[in-house]
Amino acid sequence: MPVKLCYLGNTFINSSDYQGRLKESTQCGAELIGDGSISADAEILSMTVESMLESGLKNFQISVGHSQFFYGLTKAAGLSGEQEEDLRELIANKNFFGVEVFVDSLSMNDKLRKLFGLLDNFDLQDEQLMEALKLAEGYDEILSSIDTLLKLREYLKAYGIEKYISYELGLISDYTYYTGIIFQGYTYGTGEPIVKGGRYDKLLSHFGKDAAAIGFAIVVDQLMAALSRQDIDVPVIENSSLIVFEEAAYHAAIKRSMAVSYTH
């Protein structure tokens, strides 16, 4: 049976990229472990969108890509490890003019060149993904990644959240453990993602459990900053109760607290 978990806590990132920035942040997230299906991908994305809506946000977008598209593309083009890192940095910095210059310097066939040309499209439509699928014939990793995104679109229609989802083949992550879809959420009032997530089917094997998994993490600090800058009030549920009692009234107090809990 799949396991569903949620959490809230502080995380620490020790990276040179975080110079001048806080290395500690608060995250709230959920994980679905033991289900490697596309329907599980859709469920987590739906939960991500629902979480954003429950926070009070109305204008946000979740960009969805696939980790294996980038790896498949660089493998098919025969890039060295150093070239792959150079390209990754250009894409991460959204330097697509640099990407164009980089790709022009490489020798490859027209199909691969057209696939590289999709890296700067932040909102791929069905027909563009279908065209990419045709171009990817003969390149299994690229083909599989695009096919997964097309199937995912169909699953997401059941949730009615299409307007919050966009598809971006140039989406990459700083973390190399992702094996399937990856996604990031953005809104007004913050330059950083407010939520990140993806599929990591091989990560748990390093901790003694071989299981498919997918999850997301809301960056609470970024979310709160966005809510403040958009003048969105965070709803406060005022239904808490405080029961004060003497030791002799312990049993009665417990019964009362349970009754209060069940009514809220």
Task: Report each predicted region and the residues it spans.
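Short, surface-exposed recognition loops or helix-turn segments adjacent to catalytic cores
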Residues: 59-69, 87, 166-170
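Short, surface-exposed, charged loop/turn segments at secondary-structure junctions
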Residues: 77-80, 183
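Short, conserved phosphate-binding/catalytic loop or strand-edge motifs used
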Residues: 23-28, 64-72
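Hydrophobic mid-domain F-helix/FG-region of cytochrome P450s
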Residues: 50-54, 69-78
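Acidic, His- and aromatic-enriched active-site or binding-groove loops in soluble protein domains
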Residues: 79-98
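Positively charged, Gly/Ser-enriched RNA/tRNA-binding surfaces
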Residues: 1-57, 103-262
